[in-house]
């Protein structure tokens, strides 16, 4: 653990600690690494201690971009479109699930029906929010959208049945908005 590593670094007055496994060098741990681990103990890391990385992709050139991102080591792909409850998004999601072994989050949506359709197509996570923020005009231009708190509750009602996490995307202007989103069931 980190306490043992700190002890070895101090004892030998060194700044880098080689990490060995089966007689082979697997990495180095520095005092800065230990400080980061202590400062952000809840950071989302993979089994090698690296921060997890997600990358957004759209519906154009989806497979090519996804292939490059997955080969670079991305942990999650986010199929990110303004209004994700559409045939093209469902089709791209199915293609991604058939070709890659990473989690795929899909959004943005605002209804229980969208949640059900995307989960059944393979979504591992959902992003909720169509036009709830000041910079997004999707709801105004398209006429499609639901107030953020209602959208979260509607999507969570379905996602919970499948064990799929929900992320509130937008509409979080004041500290109380985050509390409301979590209270409505967003992860």
Region locations from a protein language model:
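Glycine-rich beta-to-alpha transition loops that act as phosphate-gripper elements at the mouths
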Residues: 1, 20, 55-61, 105-114, ...
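Active-site-adjacent beta->alpha loops and helix N-cap segments on the catalytic face
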Residues: 24-44, 61-65, 81-103, 109-120, ...
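Alpha/beta catalytic cores of nucleotide-metabolism and tRNA/nucleoside-modifying enzymes
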Residues: 3, 7, 101, 121, ...
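Conserved, mostly hydrophobic/aromatic
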Residues: 53, 79, 126, 155, ...
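Short beta-strand/loop segments at the ligand-binding rim of alpha/beta enzyme cores
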Residues: 46-55, 95-110, 125, 158-170
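Catalytic cores of alpha/beta
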Residues: 64-72, 110-128, 168, 172-187
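The conserved cystathionine-beta-synthase
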Residues: 1-13, 20-21, 36-38, 60-70
């Amino acid at each position: 653990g980190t306490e043992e590593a700190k002890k070895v670094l101090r004892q030998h007055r060194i700044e880098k600690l080689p990490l060995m496994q089966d007689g082979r060098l697997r990495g180095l741990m520095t005092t800065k690494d230990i400080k980061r681990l202590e400062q952000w103990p809840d950071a989302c890391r993979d089994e090698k201690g690296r921060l997890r990385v997600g990358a957004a992709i759209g519906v154009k050139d989806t497979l090519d971009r996804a292939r490059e991102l997955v080969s670079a080591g991305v942990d999650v792909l986010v199929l990110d479109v303004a209004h994700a409850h559409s045939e093209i998004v469902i089709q791209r999601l199915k293609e991604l699930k058939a070709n890659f072994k990473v989690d795929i989050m899909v959004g943005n949506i605002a209804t229980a029906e969208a949640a059900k359709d995307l989960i059944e197509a393979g979504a591992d996570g959902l992003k909720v929010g169509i036009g709830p923020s000041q910079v997004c005009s999707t709801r105004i231009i398209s006429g499609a959208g639901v107030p953020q708190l209602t959208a979260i509750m509607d999507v969570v009602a379905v996602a919970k049945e499948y064990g799929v996490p929900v992320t509130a995307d937008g509409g979080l202007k004041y500290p109380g908005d985050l509390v409301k989103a979590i209270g409505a069931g967003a992860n």
